[in-house]
Structures are given as structure tokens and as C-alpha cells.
């Protein structure tokens, strides 16, 4: 029994897709356990970029099983489109498995998402308007439609009529918006269900059988710990649990079967949307990092907010997600800076604190306390070992590991697979 969970330790966009793709080489099953098509990940293979939103990164290994678990909310339209995109690029998808217990995102979820966000005005959360939150709301309210329901014509029709009637009352009475028509949704989405039917199964059985057989299973999280609905910067969070604990709920695999948790982070910090960001940069350094790091959302295309590396955030993520190994990405983006900074603590009303407050009001008053390190001017994109890095870059990597309190297993100096350097195999000693 061998399993590794990959989680983002910041606000998403840390490079999880790349690391998952990298670790997939030694895995036999790769599974997603939460989120939806609001999460975008980019994988570079032979200098070609592939952008995925729902399908696990392991799909590019045709001999491995890729799983969309029960904790994922699935937009069938987006999924069919993504499958067509992969087929058009010559990628086979016969190795995909989709949980019959996963909940379905329908047009009324997306419409409600937009209406709710518009109604918030200046207090908007910054949702991607993909219907994720409303779909999870229906799931919690026990009125959601699952993949198993989508495949049954009579059941889907019955539940869609009930849900649509309720949502239309909401649209008309609360939001003064036009209702949606049953006939505009039913046939289209039932057909999507038929197109993905071949992939649908009880994925909990597949995952547990694989683990019991001693196979290597890799769990791929979406978003990041700081967007976790319980442990993140609430309410500026997603509607699911990206933390490693989300695996047990979102995949149907018990906690006793999780061996290691790899936390993925960038050598700086970024975030899309609104919410607290203590180390955010508003100067030329921030603009430089954004442009060199190509910090624009995979899903939204929006410019990401960027800032210095925050070890307070990272220690919080380590604690609540049980991180055992760290993967540090995008060190090359910091090349050329005379000085690089790491936030080591916060100043809250004149008091030094080393924890991440739950209160948004306190977070607004938190000022980062920085440790400054000398930068490096060398191009490090061809470095293939820690010793190959310039001394200042090497010291930066080591200091990150010390402040977070987790050993660094891999570090990356560029987006390519070959630019990921192994310091310690996460698959060993399990």
C-alpha cells in the first residue's frame, strides 16, 4: 500500500499540475478528489503546453488509471469539451474513470453563481463563475444531481424539473432575473452523460483495490490550503477541502491508507481574486515577478496578485495538511533581483506573531516582518542539482526549508519536466 497526496500550500497556482505530472511517472493510479473546472493546471510535455481543468494530469500516461473522485463537482459540458481537446491532440483517454457519486454542475448553478457574485458588489469573493459553490451548496442541501442520476433518463428528468422549479423561483423573486427552461437543459446534458458513460464507475473500489494490491496511488489536489473552506482565508475560499484530509472524503479512501503529503509552493506567492494577502507587492518588483512568472490565471486569464514568500502561511499549511515533503517551484523567476525577501512573522498591533489569524480584521492589520537575503543574477534554468545553483539561490532554497520546517524533496527552475530536480524521492521509504 503506497499513496502520496499532492496539495497546494498557498492560494493555488503553485505548479501542482507539473509536480503531479512529474510524480505520475512512478505512480500507477492518479486521482483528483475535490474541486471542479474552476481549477486549471498546465503541463508541459516536449515543450508543448496542455491546459486541463477537470481531468487528472496522469491522463498523459495511457498505461496508468486517471480518476475523477466523488468529491469533484463535474460540469459535463466542460468535461466533454476537455475530452475532445485531448483527443484532438492525439491523447487517448481510455484510462479515465469517473465516480458515479460525483455531483453534476448544471446551467442553473453557473447562473446562480453569477447572480450571487453581482449582488455582493464591493464585497465580492472573486469566484470564477463556474458554478462550483452553488453545486456544493446543493450537495450539502441534499438536492444535488449526481453522475449516476445523470445517466438515468427518468431520474435525471424528474430531479432536474424539481431543482429547476426551485432555482427559477429564486431567480425571479430574489434576483429579478429570467428563468431557465427545462427543454434547454435536459436533452443537451443527458447527451453529455451518455458521452462520458463509458468512463463512469465506483472509483472508490478502483482506488482501494489498487492500494490493497500494493500499487502506487497519487492523489492530486486542486486550488490550495489557503483556499480550503475550513482552513483558508474564509470567506475568500473555495467550497471544498483542498487539504490532504479532503482525500478521504473526496475519494472514498480511508485515512489509514495515506502515506505521504507533498506540499507544492512557489518561491514567491500569488493569488487570484480578492482576500487577505499580507506579503502582496504593488511595486516594480511585483510587476517584474508577474511578467516573468507569467502570473495569469489558467482558468480566468486574470492577472494574479503576487508577493514575497510567506513562511507564516506555509507553516499553517504544513500543520493543517500534515505535509511531509515540500516541492519548491519557480525559483528561476526570482533571478536578477538584488535582494529577495521571506516573510518570517507578522506584526499585529505592535506584537510579533508567527501564526495566521482567522480574523479578517486582524489580517488587515498584519504587517509582514521580512528576512532579507542577497539575490542572484545568474540564469539557473539549466541547473540540474542543488549544488549547481548559485550560492545565493542555494541559500534561499535551504532557508525556505528551515523556516517551513519540512524537507524539500524537489525544486524547479522552469516549467519543463526536465527542470524539476529531485533531492529525495517521495516514493521511497513508504
Curated annotation (Swiss-Prot):
Localization per record: Cytoplasm
Cofactor requirement: Mg(2+)
Catalytic activity: IMP + L-aspartate + GTP = N(6)-(1,2-dicarboxyethyl)-AMP + GDP + phosphate + 2 H(+)
Enzyme class: ligase
SMART domains attached to this UniProt entry: Adenylsucc_synt
Binding site for GTP: 12-18, 40-42, 304, 330-332, 412-414
Record: residues binding Mg(2+): 13, 40
GO MF entries: adenylosuccinate synthase activity; GTP binding; magnesium ion binding
Sequence positions that bind substrate: 298-304
One Pfam family here: Adenylsucc_synt
Keyword presence, NAD: no
A GO-annotated cellular component: cytoplasm
Active site: 13 (proton acceptor), 41 (proton donor)
EC numbers, comma separated: 6.3.4.4
Co-factor binding details: Binds 1 Mg(2+) ion per subunit.
Residues reported in the UniProt entry to bind IMP: 13-16, 38-41, 128, 142, 223, 238, 302
InterPro entries, per database record: Adenylosuccin_syn_GTP-bd, Adenylosuccin_syn_Lys_AS, Adenylosuccinate_synth_dom1, Adenylosuccinate_synth_dom2, Adenylosuccinate_synth_dom3, Adenylosuccinate_synthetase, P-loop_NTPase
Biological processes, Gene Ontology terms: 'de novo' AMP biosynthetic process; IMP metabolic process
Main location: cytoplasm
Keywords linked to the UniProt accession: Cytoplasm, GTP-binding, Ligase, Magnesium, Metal-binding, Nucleotide-binding, Purine biosynthesis
Pathway participation: Purine metabolism; AMP biosynthesis via de novo pathway; AMP from IMP: step 1/2
Function recorded in the entry: Plays an important role in the de novo pathway of purine nucleotide biosynthesis. Catalyzes the first committed step in the biosynthesis of AMP from IMP.
NCBIfam families: PRK01117.1, purA
Family: Belongs to the adenylosuccinate synthetase family.
Subunit structure: Homodimer.
The protein's name in its UniProt record: Adenylosuccinate synthetase
Amino acid at each position: 500500500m503506497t499513496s502520496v497526496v499532492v496539495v497546494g500550500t498557498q492560494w493555488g497556482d503553485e505548479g501542482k499540475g507539473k509536480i503531479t505530472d512529474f510524480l505520475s511517472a512512478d505512480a500507477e493510479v492518479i486521482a483528483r478528489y475535490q474541486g471542479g473546472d474552476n481549477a486549471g493546471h498546465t503541463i508541459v510535455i516536449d515543450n508543448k503546453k496542455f491546459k486541463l481543468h477537470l481531468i487528472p494530469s496522469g491522463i498523459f500516461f495511457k498505461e496508468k488509471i486517471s480518476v475523477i473522485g466523488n468529491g469533484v463537482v463535474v460540469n459535463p459540458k466542460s468535461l466533454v469539451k476537455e475530452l475532445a481537446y485531448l483527443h484532438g491532440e492525439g491523447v487517448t483517454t481510455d484510462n479515465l474513470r469517473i465516480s458515479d457519486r460525483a455531483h453534476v454542475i448544471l446551467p442553473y448553478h453557473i447562473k446562480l453563481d453569477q447572480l450571487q457574485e453581482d449582488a455582493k458588489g464591493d464585497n465580492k469573493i472573486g469566484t470564477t463563475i463556474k458554478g462550483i459553490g452553488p453545486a456544493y451548496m446543493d450537495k450539502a442541501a441534499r438536492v444535488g444531481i449526481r453522475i449516476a442520476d445523470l445517466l438515468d433518463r427518468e431520474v435525471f428528468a424528474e430531479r432536474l424539473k424539481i431543482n429547476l422549479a426551485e432555482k427559477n423561483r429564486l431567480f425571479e423573486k430574489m434576483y429579478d432575473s429570467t428563468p431557465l427552461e427545462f427543454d434547454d437543459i435536459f436533452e443537451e446534458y443527458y447527451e453529455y452523460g451518455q458521452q462520458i458513460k463509458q468512463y463512469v464507475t465506483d472509483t472508490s473500489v478502483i482506488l482501494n483495490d489498487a492500494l490493497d494490491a500494493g500499487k502506487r496511488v497519487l492523489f492530486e489536489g486542486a486550488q490550495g490550503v489557503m483556499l480550503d473552506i475550513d482552513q483558508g482565508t474564509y470567506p475568500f475560499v473555495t467550497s471544498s477541502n483542498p487539504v490532504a484530509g479532503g482525500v478521504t472524503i473526496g475519494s472514498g479512501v480511508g485515512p489509514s491508507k495515506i502515506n505521504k503529503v507533498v506540499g507544492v509552493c512557489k518561491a514567491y506567492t500569488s493569488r487570484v481574486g480578492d482576500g487577505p494577502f499580507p506579503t502582496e507587492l504593488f511595486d516594480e518588483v511585483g510587476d517584474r515577478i508577474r511578467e516573468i512568472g507569467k502570473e495569469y490565471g489558467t482558468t480566468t486569464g486574470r492577472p494574479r496578485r503576487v508577493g514575497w514568500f510567506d513562511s507564516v502561511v506555509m507553516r499553517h499549511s504544513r500543520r493543517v495538511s500534515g505535509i511531509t515533503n515540500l516541492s519548491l517551484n519557480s525559483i528561476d523567476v526570482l533571478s536578477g533581483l538584488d535582494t529577495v525577501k521571506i516573510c518570517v512573522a507578522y506584526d499585529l498591533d505592535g506584537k510579533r506573531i508567527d501564526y495566521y489569524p482567522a480574523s479578517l480584521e486582524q489580517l488587515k492589520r498584519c504587517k509582514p516582518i521580512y528576512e532579507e537575503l542577497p539575490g542572484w543574477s545568474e540564469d539557473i534554468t539549466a541547473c540540474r542539482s542543488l549544488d549547481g545553483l548559485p550560492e545565493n539561490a542555494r541559500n534561499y532554497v535551504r532557508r525556505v526549508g528551515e523556516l517551513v520546517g519540512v524537507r524539500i524533496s524537489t525544486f524547479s527552475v522552469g516549467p519543463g519536466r526536465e527542470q524539476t530536480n529531485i533531492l529525495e524521492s517521495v516514493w521511497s521509504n513508504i
